[in-house]
Each structure stands twice: as structure tokens, then as C-alpha cells.
Swiss-Prot record:
Record's function text: One of several proteins that assist in the late maturation steps of the functional core of the 30S ribosomal subunit. Associates with free 30S ribosomal subunits (but not with 30S subunits that are part of 70S ribosomes or polysomes). Required for efficient processing of 16S rRNA. May interact with the 5'-terminal helix region of 16S rRNA.
Protein name as catalogued: Ribosome-binding factor A
Record carries keyword Cell wall biogenesis/degradation: no
NCBIfam families: rbfA (TIGR00082)
Predominant location category: cytoplasm
Subunit structure: Monomer. Binds 30S ribosomal subunits, but not 50S ribosomal subunits or 70S ribosomes.
Organism: Buchnera aphidicola subsp. Acyrthosiphon pisum (strain Tuc7)
Compartment annotation: Cytoplasm
Keywords assigned: Cytoplasm, Ribosome biogenesis
GO cellular component term of the entry, any: cytosol
InterPro entries noted in UniProt: KH_dom-like_a/b, RbfA, RbfA_dom_sf, Ribosome-bd_factorA_CS
GO biological process entries: maturation of SSU-rRNA
């Protein structure tokens, strides 16, 4: 019987939970104090890198979003250190944060469709 998930998918799911908890509870930087959602985690096959896609509650200003992503990338070594303590992995992947704007795009499309149905 074929496995439903491979190891990198299971690790990506666990990383998503742990990183969301770390960002919410352990990061004390006041410049990042907003609601951050970890929407997706992609782990490389050799588990050396993890791309973390995050979205922000107040993501209207593009400059603020870029600044917050930069701050998260600077804090990635600290987050990785906390992950080493919380996960029992031989190799904890290097973390790279990216902005996920799919929610904003989806919201924009639904507003356009709603306006079309009203006409």
C-alpha cells in the first residue's frame, strides 16, 4: 500500500505548527507585532531548506510587508534555534520567509465577481 504522505510533507506540516507557535509566542520584536498566519511550508527533498509563506492581517502597505518579511528573515536563525529544541530532527532546515498574498488576490477576485453579479 502506498504512503499517503512522504517524510518531507509530514515535516512541513509539523514545521508549520511549530513556526506559527514560535512567531506568536516567542518573538518579542515590537515591529512584528501583528497577526501573522503561516499559510504554507515547502521543504526541500533533502530537508536543508524550508520556504515559509506567511500572510499578515494588515497587509495593505507593500513597504510594511517587505519590512516585516525582512525582519522575519533576520530572526530566522533564532526561530531555527527554537525549532531545534522543539523538534527531534537530525537536520533542522534553514528558514526563508516569503509573503503569501493569495488571500488578498482571492478577496479581490471575489469582490469583482460580487460587483459583476450586482450589475
Amino acid at each position: 500500500m502506498e504512503k499517503l504522505f512522504n517524510r518531507s510533507d509530514r515535516i512541513a506540516q509539523e514545521l508549520q505548527k511549530k513556526i506559527a507557535a514560535i512567531i506568536q509566542h516567542s518573538l518579542k520584536d515590537p515591529r512584528i507585532k501583528t497577526i501573522i498566519t503561516v499559510s504554507e511550508v515547502q521543504v526541500s527533498k533533502d530537508l536543508s531548506y524550508a520556504q515559509i509563506f506567511v500572510s499578515f492581517l494588515e497587509s495593505d502597505n507593500n513597504e510594511k510587508v517587505k519590512k516585516k518579511i525582512t525582519l522575519l528573515n533576520r530572526a530566522s536563525s533564532y526561530i531555527r534555534k527554537l525549532l531545534c529544541k522543539r523538534m527531534k530532527l537530525r537536520i533542522v532546515p534553514n528558514i526563508i520567509f516569503h509573503h503569501d498574498d493569495s488571500f488578498l488576490k482571492g478577496n479581490k477576485i471575489s469582490c469583482i465577481l460580487e460587483n459583476l453579479t450586482k450589475k
